[in-house]
Amino acid sequence: MAESTPKLSLLETRILGTLVEKQRTVPDTYPLSVNALMAGCNQKTSRNPVIETSEAEIVHALDSLKDLGLVREVSGSRVSRFEHLFEKALGVPTQASALLTVLMLRGPQTAGELRLNCERLHRFADISSVEAFLEELAAKEDGALVVELPRLPGSRENRWMHLLSGEPMIEAGAAGRSPSTGMQDIEELRARVSSLEAEVAELRALLLERSRE
């Protein structure tokens, strides 16, 4: 994303992340209708923060994303559907796109968490490959797309966050809320459960979408 491009809102990044996610996990529903997008954005699993947005807000955000060349409307259907132009617009490969998508949908994460949470979008061989793509995104000549955050006390890994919504604000009290090293395995198990819950939610959304057509 060029430096002159306006920074995206939370809803705009949520829409982009949802479009990329659903394209790869439930391709039969892609491109997405406004209703499907709203369901994906308001999803309770695999989302941080969880939001509650309206159809009107989705449509307004889609108009902004279309103006930025990040989304386009697809013709040929009685229901308006939308697809992303994320990888082309940002000039990133599918591996990097998967990482950015999970960061947009789930917030800051360690390389280990990203590898786990990206499994359904792209299966990375190891954490080193995740870190390599993150470092490329952080060093992009036309503007960094991710940043490595300071390591929190008790953590084994640094967290990463995307920069599509601007530079991060480091909270002074963040260190006091960091998980201990012994909690890492529990967090990974929670991530796996969340991934399974997301699959169930997507199957339900697919059935609902087909029932409306």
From Swiss-Prot:
Pfam families xrefs: DUF480
InterPro entries xrefs: DUF480 (IPR007432), WH-like_DNA-bd_sf (IPR036388), WH_DNA-bd_sf (IPR036390)
Superkingdom, natural source: Bacteria
Family: Belongs to the UPF0502 family.
Protein name: UPF0502 protein Daro_2469
Source organism (scientific name): Dechloromonas aromatica (strain RCB)
